[in-house]
């Protein structure tokens, strides 16, 4: 760690502390996370989920990992330094945030979650303290509790800060998955409008009561699994009927109707009914002008959604919903997407949202060669409903296994294309025209030679002798018939063959 000079400690947690430092050579300010656990070798270090997640998740809305250092059994993560987080920006604020600012923040959080979930990870500890701000750009940090979507449950029941914890986690469910991040986004969005936590419970039971007070208690019709979880732990939901008028309209008077609808969708009890990040991004709440500085290159959304379509992680039986309409109301949508709308007309599966024209980022994971199979994507028709997740089996891409097929290099892809196309090209080639054989003149018959009378008689005698059977040929091969049959004679082996083999064996 001689490369860095420590400045001050800026944070402390259960798993490690964060130190502000400076690179001695370059003068760059960095944030170093020092793990409290001791590690003897690299084999033990690479098993950390945080390392697995940060190595794979490279995105403009995710904090950048610069390097990992193991020194004297201490493990250090070196990140880019981001001074402010969302909690510090709103805790001492007295004036409400503009709606455009809230929209831009939630939009970037959903972009990051969409990238994380489609790459097989969910955060599990989403809260304002872990959302870093640098100008208009937002970045999610602290992946210490991140898990892979395809990892096998049970999971830890005590995760994330209690105020942003999903109901299924509060009920000690160990089979939760990525929708818990969606619940946290809904709680954060409501807090941005009110500048105070939406559900500030003092305990898990108090947290559930505060949720029921605002959202109403779940029923067997709205969340049958939640009723079963509550009964298994001896908990009974309070008898709070959902009000006819959404209470969020009263609690968040500065939020428009679209914002109230989106928060209500994000805070649904049943995790299977919560929208995916991609569906939330298509809500009409975002059908306004978004600053180009926070928009991502189309590939960030296009590639991930094409991956979902290709592997069937998006439910095809989703009906239309006005909240997720396909109207092209966003002025920032890329006009070039019209040229791609005809690519998948025959494909009845839903497609990703329309492209957004932004400068091409420098991230290496956007190289076209690695995603060459995802280039031509139609962006018109989108999976538009967030309510039709109620099925007996787990639907959506949350609880599906992600494709683990390794990406192929362009050279191997070209070789495979040649192996597929070459037989087709050969079949399409016309067969060679067969030329008729050239007619040859018939051979001229030569006249028979003139024989004398004596020669003719000799020739006739030779022909008569050839037609008569010979005595020697008739009885020539009958000597073996009188040979004695051996006692061990087998069917299919003649005695003559047996005598010859026995004589040879004696020799």
Swiss-Prot record:
First-level EC class: transferase
Matching Pfam families: Pkinase
BP terms from Gene Ontology: intracellular signal transduction
The protein's name in its UniProt record: Probable serine/threonine-protein kinase DDB_G0268078
Signal peptide: none
Residue ranges with Pro residues bias: 429-450
Bias (Low complexity) ranges: 323-347, 381-399, 451-470
GO molecular function: ATP binding; cyclin-dependent protein serine/threonine kinase activity; protein serine kinase activity; protein serine/threonine kinase activity
PANTHER family reported for this sequence: MITOGEN-ACTIVATED PROTEIN KINASE (PTHR24055)
EC identifiers of the protein: 2.7.11.22
Active site (catalytic residues): 125
Organism placement in taxonomy: Eukaryota, Amoebozoa, Evosea, Eumycetozoa, Dictyostelia
Gene Ontology cellular component annotations, sorted alphabetically: cytoplasm; nucleus
Biased composition range(s): Polar residues: 348-361, 471-481, 491-507
């Amino acid at each position: 760690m001689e490369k860095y000079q420590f400045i001050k400690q800026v944070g402390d947690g259960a798993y490690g502390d964060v130190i502000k430092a400076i690179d001695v050579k370059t003068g760059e300010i960095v944030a170093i996370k020092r793990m409290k656990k001791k590690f003897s070798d690299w084999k033990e270090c690479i098993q950390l989920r945080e390392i697995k997640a940060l190595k794979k998740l490279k995105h403009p809305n995710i904090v950048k990992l610069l390097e990992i250092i193991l020194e004297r059994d201490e493990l250090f993560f070196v990140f880019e330094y981001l001074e402010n987080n969302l909690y510090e920006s709103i805790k001492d604020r007295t004036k409400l945030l503009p709606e455009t600012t809230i929209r831009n923040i939630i939009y970037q959080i959903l972009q990051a979650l969409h990238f994380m979930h489609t790459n097989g990870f969910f955060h599990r500890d989403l809260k304002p303290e872990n959302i870093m701000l640098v100008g208009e750009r937002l970045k999610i940090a602290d992946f210490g509790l991140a898990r892979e979507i395809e990892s096998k449950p049970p999971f830890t029941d005590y995760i994330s800060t209690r105020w942003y914890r999903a109901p299924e986690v509060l009920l000690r469910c160990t089979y939760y998955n990525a929708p818990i991040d969606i619940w946290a986004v809904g709680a954060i969005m409501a807090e941005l409008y009110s500048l105070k936590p939406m559900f500030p419970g003092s305990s898990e039971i108090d947290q559930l009561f505060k949720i029921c007070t605002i959202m109403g208690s779940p029923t067997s019709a709205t969340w049958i699994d939640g009723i079963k979880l509550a009964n298994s732990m001896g908990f009974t939901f309070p008898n709070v009927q959902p009000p006819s008028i959404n209470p969020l309209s009263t609690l968040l008077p500065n939020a428009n109707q679209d914002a109230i609808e989106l928060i209500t969708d994000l805070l649904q009890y049943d995790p299977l009914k919560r929208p995916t990040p991609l569906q939330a991004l298509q809500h009409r709440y975002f059908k306004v002008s978004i600053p180009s500085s926070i928009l991502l290159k189309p590939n960030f959304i296009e590639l991930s959604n094409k991956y979902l379509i290709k592997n069937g992680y998006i439910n095809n039986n989703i009906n239309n919903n006005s909240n997720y309409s396909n109207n092209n109301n966003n002025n920032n949508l890329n006009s070039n997407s019209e040229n791609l709308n005809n690519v998948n007309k025959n494909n009845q599966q839903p497609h990703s949202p329309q492209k957004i024209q932004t400068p091409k980022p420098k991230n290496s994971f956007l190289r076209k060669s690695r995603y060459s199979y995802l280039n031509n994507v139609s962006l018109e028709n989108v999976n538009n409903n967030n309510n039709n997740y109620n099925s007996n089996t787990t639907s959506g891409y949350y609880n599906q296994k992600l494709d683990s097929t390794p990406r192929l290099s362009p050279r191997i892809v070209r070789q495979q294309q040649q192996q597929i196309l070459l037989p087709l090209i050969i079949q399409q080639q016309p067969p060679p025209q067969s030329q008729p054989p050239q007619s040859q003149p018939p051979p001229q018959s030569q006249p028979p030679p003139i024989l004398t009378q004596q020669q003719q008689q000799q020739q006739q005698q030779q022909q008569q002798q050839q037609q008569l059977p010979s005595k020697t040929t008739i009885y020539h091969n009958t000597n073996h018939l009188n040979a004695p049959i051996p006692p061990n004679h087998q069917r299919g082996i003649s005695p003559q063959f047996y005598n010859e083999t026995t004589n040879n064996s004696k020799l």
